[in-house]
Amino acid sequence: MRYALRLAALLLLCSGLFAGPAFALSLNEAKAQGLVGERIDGFVGIVVADPPTAVRQLVEQVNNQRREKYDEVAKQRGVPLDAVAKITGEKQLERTPAGQYFAGADGRWQQK
């Protein structure tokens, strides 16, 4: 079961789902600028206190896309959505490059 969840998470990472929408600012650019970071729960979050509207929209769209994909995988595997999201979140944190932000289990933003 755990193997199946990890495989599903890996497939999600490879699916291109995390490339971000076609905003003026991509998800990767927002991460590189320290505006957005990965959360351990499998979603992205806003790092800065007063983000531009485009950043808020980007985060909302990416999280909606992720939630849909997590739900699809969870239904296929017969596991809770949270389990799929958590495993994917752990993988995303592992892949976060040095200098970018992530929120750990305590919810605080840290620079890797």
Residue ranges and their predicted role:
Residues 8-19:
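Bacterial N-terminal signal peptides
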Residues 1-9:
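Bacterial N-terminal signal peptides that target proteins for export
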Residues 2-3, 22-112:
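Anionic, Ser/Thr-rich low-complexity intrinsically disordered regions
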